[in-house]
Amino acid sequence: MTKIINLFGGPGIGKSSIASGLTYKLKKKHINCDNPYEFPKVLAWDENHSAIKDQLYVLANQHRGIVKSFGKVDFIILDSPIILSLVYKSLYKGTEYPATLYGEYFDKMVLDIHNQYDNLNILLKRTEGGYNEKERYQSLDESKILDNEIENTLIKNNISYITIEVGDNTVNDIVKLLV
């Protein structure tokens, strides 16, 4: 059965780089894995500010990345786990349509989908380093706030996770958990 590796952390913490490193290391060990594209980053590069506020749209596209390789690989590595739709829905809720549409039923759907999978949830802890605002909607300070919001969302929804500090050995530390 396919295991989902969810990398959690705010923008700029290194999720995409770590996901790429994990994909490389696992494939070098002849372990089948996939690292679907990070749909919110596509929206950021396209400067599509309205679409990022539509978390149903984001969720559907992120989930499609899982569906296309589920059952075909051993691991799917996500640098934008679907649970993040709960965090960003709350961030944009009440600001404008369509974010105002998504309430508790949306939350339940996101959690139900997440819970259907065999997940390894990894919360990345930010260390000092560079931050590229060109690929983001948030500043470094806003990203640090989101780090806390993400952890609070995991705790609030009783989602178990492992905490790993981001550093030179992060990829190797995660690989050791998997193989």
Where are these regions (language model features)?
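Phosphate-binding P-loop
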Residues: M1-I4
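Walker A (P-loop) phosphate-binding loop of P-loop NTPases
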Residues: G12
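Conserved lysine of the Walker
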Residues: K15
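Active-site flanking residues adjacent to catalytic metal/cofactor-binding acidic residues
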Residues: Y37, L78-S80, L124
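Hydrophobic anchor at the beta1->P-loop junction of P-loop NTPases
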Residues: L7
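A glycine- and Lys/Arg-enriched "phosphate-lid" helix/loop adjacent to the NTP-binding pocket
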Residues: K93-N169
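Conserved substrate/cofactor phosphate-moiety recognition/catalytic segment
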Residues: S20-R64
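Conserved nucleotide-sensing/catalytic segment adjacent to the nucleotide-binding pocket
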Residues: N48-Y97
